[in-house]
Amino acid sequence: MRILGIDPGLRRTGFGVVDAEGSRLRYIASGTIVVPPDLALAQRLKVILDNLREVARETRPDVAALEIVFLNANPSSTLLLGHARGAALCALAESGLDVHEYTALQIKKSTVGTGRAAKEQVQMMVQHLLSLNGTPAPDSADALACAICHAHTGPLQERLSPLAATSRSGKSRIRKGRLLG
C-alpha cells in the first residue's frame, strides 16, 4: 500500500510518500511546498492545491493520511491552517484518494511511542524507521510520520470497522477470534 502523508500549513505544507507491506516501510518521496507569503490567500491555497495534485499524480498513492487541526491560542492562525487543510483535502479528493485523518497525538504515539514527543524526536524516528541517510526537514518528517501512522494503524482500523458496525446492530458475534454472521 502506498501512502501519501500530508502536514498542512499555509506557509509550508509537508508531504511524504511511503510504501507499506506488512510491517516493512519503504521511503518513496518527501518534500515541502513553500508558499510565497506575498500572495493573496486564494492564490496561496491554489499553490498548495496544485502542488499536492502534482505530487499525487507523480507518486500514485493508494491512500492519503492527513493531520487533524485543533484550536490553538490564536483563533485566526487556526482558521488559516484550516484553509490550508481544505486545499489539501480538495487535492486529495480530486485525485480520487480515500483520506484518513489522525491527531498529532496519534501520529507521535504511533511513530515515536509517546504522544508528547518533540519535533526532533519525530525527525529522528522517521529517519530510523525509513532508513534515511539524513534527517528529514521538519515539515517533511511530520508528513512522513503521518504516513507511517496510517501504515501502523490503518489496516487495523479497516479490519475492525466491520466488527464495530455489526456489533452495534447485534447481528454478529465473535467466537474463537472469528467474526460470525
From Swiss-Prot:
Q: Which cofactors are required for activity?
A: Mg(2+)
The record's section on SUPFAM superfamilies has: Ribonuclease H-like
Q: Give the keywords, sorted.
A: Cytoplasm, DNA damage, DNA recombination, DNA repair, DNA-binding, Endonuclease, Hydrolase, Magnesium, Metal-binding, Nuclease
Binding of Mg(2+) 2, residues: 67
Q: Where does Mg(2+) 1 bind?
A: 7, 139
Task: Indicate whether Nucleotide-binding appears among the record's keywords.
Answer: no
Q: What does the record say about how the cofactor binds?
A: Binds 2 Mg(2+) ion per subunit.
Q: Which GO terms describe its biological process?
A: DNA recombination; DNA repair
The record's similarity note reads: Belongs to the RuvC family.
> In its UniProt entry, what is this protein called?
Crossover junction endodeoxyribonuclease RuvC
Organism whose genome encodes this protein: Bordetella avium (strain 197N)
Q: Which gene encodes it?
A: ruvC
